[in-house]
Amino acid sequence: MVNIPKTRNTFCKKCKGYSAHKVSQAKKSKDNPRAQGNRRYARKQRGYGGQTKPILRRKAKVTKKLVLNLECTKCKFSHQKPLKRAKHVIFGGERKRKGEALVY
């Protein structure tokens, strides 16, 4: 489980300096039906001959890579930062303290 703070002080390309950024998780955008791969696939599928490419039957990965959206609080410019793989992500959760008693 990964706990990420909701704000992060990092470099902004537009402001050309360090400033606070609002952190959120990037979502997958809608596929473009006119992308080169889709155009090629549609062309290949036309006519006789059935299915031309293998249909993926099983997933290879269990998790997805975490991508952060970082939005500058000064100029509202947004950029993305990829992180490692994680199953569970929490934004702004409680931080662990050293030597604190366990609460059940």
UniProtKB/Swiss-Prot annotation:
The keyword Ribosomal protein applies. It comes from Encephalitozoon cuniculi (strain GB-M1) (Microsporidian parasite). It comes from the Eukaryota. One of its GO terms (biological process) is translation. This is Large ribosomal subunit protein eL42. PANTHER family: 60S RIBOSOMAL PROTEIN L36A/L44 (PTHR10369). The lineage of its organism: Eukaryota, Fungi, Fungi incertae sedis, Microsporidia, Unikaryonidae. The gene is RPL44. Residues 22-56 are annotated as: Disordered. GO terms for molecular function: structural constituent of ribosome.
